[in-house]
Each structure stands twice: as C-alpha cells, then as structure tokens.
C-alpha cells in the first residue's frame, strides 16, 4: 500500500547547489509514490495506490487501517509529516499497520545501505504489468465507519459541542474531519487552512499542532464562534493538538493542550 501527502520538494532552505541539475526539485509526494510503484512492480511486488486523478488523500492513520484491511505485507507513506517540505521522505509500516521498532528498524536500514542496483519500471509500464492496483472508496468508508463505532458517547445535539477543526493545509479532513461529521458533529472550519497545500501559506511557524503558534488562526475562529474545542492535525494527520475553552459556554479563554495532556484526558475519560 502506498499513500502520499501534499508536499512538493522545493529546496526552500537552499541546501542544494542551484548550478547543478537536480531531477528531484519540483516533484510531489505523488510522484515519489508512483516511482516506488515502479520499483515494487519491477521486483514482482503488488502495490495499491490512489488513482492519480483522485481528489482525496490517504492520511497515515487510514494507511494503517488499509494495510490490515487488504492483508498487505506493509505500507509506505511519502510525506514530510510535520516537517518542512524539503524533508519529504517515507514512513514504512508493517503488516500490523505499525511502524517498525528496534531492532527491526535498524535491520531495515542496514538492508537499504547494502542495495547497489535498483530494478525499476516506468509508471506506465508498472501499471501495464498488472501489479499496480488502484484503491476505491471501500477502504476509506470502512475506516470512517470503524472510527465512528469506536466513539464512547452518542452523537451530540446540534450546537451542544462546538468544535473548530483545521488540517493545517494537510490531509486531516479526510480522516478526523470526516469522522467528526459522521458522528454528528458540525466542525467549524478554518477557511484559510482547509485546502491541501504543501507550502502551508497560512500556517504560522510550522505545520505542527504541538506548536501553539500554529493554532493562532484556529483560535481566532474559535473566539468568534464561542467554540468549546479546537482540534488540529498535522499534514499527514497522525499528530493532534488542540485548545479547550475554560468555560462550558465557550466564552472563556483557551488553554493549549499538548500531546501528553490529551492522552491523559482521553485515558481518564475512557477509564
């Protein structure tokens, strides 16, 4: 299984010599995924990927679900996660939908270092080989429904809980946003940050929801709408951050919640 986020390799930090030819510049995560499909197909491995014309993306949590749903041997997500676009790379997931841990991760790294030649097919030849399979909406619908069923509370009454949501120009709407809607919430969008855009034009500092400054726009919307919560996801949607209003009617101040605090609150609620 292969997925991709919205990044394009632009060398924003200027670390490459502009006088040298560089075929990487300008490539998107989708291009890298198609190249990976060519490597897999050339080596007799079947790969599943969204069609190039798809209007949605596969967030990292959904990738983990899709691996198990398709009984795949693993998954690969081309993403820079919450880092600058120049850090576009890959996240590998095992057949369990989890990232490898020690010592497996080190063994994989050593295997990569020993590779001296690469068998590769062009994208067109990889598709013609029959080893590239295009994902339909079935897995996506299954993922949203699975998440919805995990909810411990009934759907809220209209306006009972007002939630502002931002994917920070990433792909989080396709998981967190849709799950909120499926469960009966009416998430209030941050209009400037809803469109997937790997240059993050409307994000302060960094697209990392664990950095409070990147929630400035969302907090502004929350104050205007007297929202109870702000929920933000990082570009590939496997990292969350948020704000909570200090008053139940949404008229208080907003308190930033880091990952440890969110985990503690959710664990306490579930127990």
PLM feature segments, named:
Residues 1-6, 162-165:
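Short glycine-rich phosphate-binding loop at a beta-alpha junction
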Residues 3-87, 179-242:
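N-terminal small/polar loop signature for handling phosphorylated ligands or for N-terminal nucleophile
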Residues 25, 29, 104, 260:
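Short, conserved glycine- and acidic-residue-centered signature motifs
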Residues 60, 105, 260-264:
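Amphipathic alpha-helical transducer elements in NTP-driven molecular machines
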Residues 64, 177, 264-268:
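Short, hydrophobic alpha-helix immediately C-terminal to the catalytic nucleophile
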Residues 69, 114, 182, 269-270:
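Active-site catalytic microenvironments for nucleophilic, acid-base chemistry
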Residues 86-217, 221-222:
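Gly/Ser/Thr-enriched, mixed-charge loops and adjacent short helices
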């Amino acid at each position: 299984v292969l997925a991709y986020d919205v990044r394009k390799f632009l060398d924003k930090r200027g670390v490459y010599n502009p006088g040298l030819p560089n075929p990487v510049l300008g490539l998107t995560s989708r291009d890298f995924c198609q190249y990976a499909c060519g490597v897999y197909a050339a080596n007799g491995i079947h790969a599943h990927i969204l069609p190039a014309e798809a209007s949605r993306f596969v967030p990292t949590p959904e990738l983990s679900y899709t691996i198990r749903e398709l009984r795949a041997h693993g998954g690969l997500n081309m993403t820079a996660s919450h880092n600058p676009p120049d850090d576009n790379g890959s996240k590998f997931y095992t057949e369990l939908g989890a990232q490898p841990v020690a010592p497996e991760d080190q063994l994989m790294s050593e295997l990569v270092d020993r590779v001296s030649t690469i068998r590769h097919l062009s994208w067109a030849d990889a598709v013609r080989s029959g080893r590239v399979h295009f994902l339909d909406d079935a897995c996506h619908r299954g993922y949203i429904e699975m998440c919805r069923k995990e909810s411990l509370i009934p759907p809220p009454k209209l306006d009972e809980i007002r939630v502002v949501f931002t994917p920070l120009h990433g792909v989080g709407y396709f998981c967190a946003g849709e799950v909120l809607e499926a469960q009966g919430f009416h998430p209030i969008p941050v209009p400037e940050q809803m469109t997937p855009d790997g240059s993050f034009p409307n994000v302060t500092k960094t697209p990392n929801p664990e950095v409070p400054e990147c929630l400035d726009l969302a907090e502004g919307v929350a104050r205007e709408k007297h929202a109870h919560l702000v929920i933000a996801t990082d570009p590939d949607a496997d990292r969350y951050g948020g704000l909570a209003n200090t008053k139940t009617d949404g008229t208080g101040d907003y308190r930033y919640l880091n990952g440890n605090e969110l985990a503690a609150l959710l664990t306490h609620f579930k127990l």
